[in-house]
Amino acid sequence: MRETDDRCRLVLIPPPTEDIEKQAQQLEEALGAGDVATVILPQYGRDDQQFQIAAEHIVPIAQAHGAAALIAGDSRTAGRSKADGLHFEGSIEDLRDTLAKHTPKMIVGAGGASERHKALEIGEAQPDYIFFGKIEGDIKPEPHPKNLALAEWWASMVEIPCIVMGGNEVASVVAAAETGAEFVALRLAVFEHPEGPAAAIATANALLDEKAPRFNA
């Protein structure tokens, strides 16, 4: 078992961009600098053709570095780009349908867990993970307190892994890890880091190595 398997790990979310080739290069740098479990690529405002092009750039890079590549958007794009799975946000009924259609062949995780009741409804559907926060929710240096509270509550009682959205500073991974969450998602903290994505990932992993609780302690 790798040392990182026993503590909170990183999830990367590339921000919206018109220069997908530059972002692909940034992702390559980031993933080459340290452990990342998963890359989630959102559709944002792209049309299906633009999103397909983005996925064809991002998915192979993630997979080449051992990270799962998930598509947040059109499931057809996930299939055509040979992504590992889907990040789903929508109704409980649609989540159940998506899980029935795509699992166990693909990873299917779920967002939209804005409060405890909704989180438990999502959990009953048995996704592969639950996501606390909004994909574009890294508007402050630190994670949103509500998301930290939800993650701590969830991690203490439910076996389904959770991802908590971090802040726009790398140091926010510590607060996220302290909740007991299995994963912390970073977006702007990595892709807009003043020293570059590689420095951000190296720093984040160093902080998690030093300060994240161990699951089997």
Please place each PLM-identified region on the residue numbering:
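Flexible, gly/pro- and Lys/Arg-enriched active-site loops
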Residues: 93-96, 134-157
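Short capping loops/turns at secondary-structure boundaries
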Residues: 112, 144-147, 166
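Glycine-rich anion-binding loop/nest that anchors nucleotide
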Residues: 131, 162-168, 185
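Conserved N-terminal beta1-alpha1 strand-loop-helix module at the mouth
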Residues: 1-87, 92, 101-108, 113-128, ...
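Active-site-adjacent loop and "lid" segments of alpha/beta metabolic enzymes
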Residues: 31, 142, 164
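Short, well-ordered turn and helix-capping elements at secondary-structure junctions
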Residues: 16, 136-139, 188
